[in-house]
Amino acid sequence: MEERFPIPAGLSDCLQTEYGFVLRDIAPAERGFYGETWKIRTHAGAYFAKLDRWPCHKESYRASLPIVQYIADGGIAFVPRVIATRRGQLCCAFQGGILAVFAFAPGALLEEYAVEDLYGCLSQVYALRTDGLALEAEDFGCAIPQTCARLAQAPELPDAARVALEKRQSAIARYANRLARFSAICQKDRSDFHITHGDAGGNFLSDGKQFFLVDWDSVKLAPIERDAWVFMSNPAQLCAIQRTINQNGIAYSLRWERLCYYSYFYFFSYLEGYLSSILSAAQERRGAQIAADMAAYLADSWIYARLDAADASVTENSLAASFAQAEKTPCKSAGSTLQ
């Protein structure tokens, strides 16, 4: 459920000082986990302002802004442009956080969409040149389980979080071993990298006329599987993604070992996000709520279907076989989400 945060004291003054905005209206907007977001109306039009205060995340938010601007400069209209401050900066400091303003994107988050629509958009981003781009590149590392283990030893971690981790101890160890295995396989080939979003399906918007893809905080130079792994348990969807990117000029074939790697990696990435957020939460009540969310994530969440598919592929190579079968089977397009 999306939270709506109140308007902080001084935000209007900051926007006027840093951006020269004459505000007509400001109101909380739907936001993700880390960012506090507001819709602002000015004499020049409407914008979104997003503030990230989290010590464990705000620097990645700051680092993503030049990449967002590069994408927008490349003619990608569905990625809202970053609005520069009066001094030409892409962000400013506010109450210990990073504040940035974006062009207004009308519409709402799509709970359901055709993968052809999403990957038709992403293909335009994948087609952008990346040589000389100052962007972190994928290394297919496998150290993240150790990071999670270190965070789990923090004395201030709530008991509820410790209990949740103990209940999944054997599964966590198995996933760590699988991650190490696929890390070793994937590190042998670091070719065919593109600008990837990292959570595209959760940030795909539409107003019925056009699409928007927002929140590029986790942008990275990586293979397309970094975006596609969420469809790991649905070979027909992977088939549709494959066909869509190829039809849009991206000469690449999805690789099952990379899909497996990201399934295991993101299990730990989300876990690390929970643990880091619990430990850096400004309020004890907020930390307790995140601990409860982490317990629910570990107990039963959408990611286990992807992990089950990856596990099956390790023992039976069933993912590669089912994906190959899906490629041979004509996939009827679900049609565009747009009317």
Task: Explain the meaning of each model-derived region.
Residues 195, 206-257:
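Active-site Asp-x-Gly
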Residues 189-194:
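Protein kinase catalytic-loop region centered on the HRD/HxD motif
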Residues 272-339:
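ATP/Mg2+ or Mg2+-diphosphate-binding catalytic cores
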Residues 202-204:
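Catalytic-loop signature of eukaryotic-like protein kinases
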Residues 1-84, 210, 319, 323-326, ...:
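Conserved NTP-binding catalytic cores of kinases and kinase-like/nucleotidyltransferase enzymes
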Residues 112-167:
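A cross-family kinase active-site recognition segment
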Residues 199:
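Conserved catalytic-loop position in the HRD/HxD motif
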Residues 45-134:
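ATP-binding pocket architecture of kinase catalytic cores
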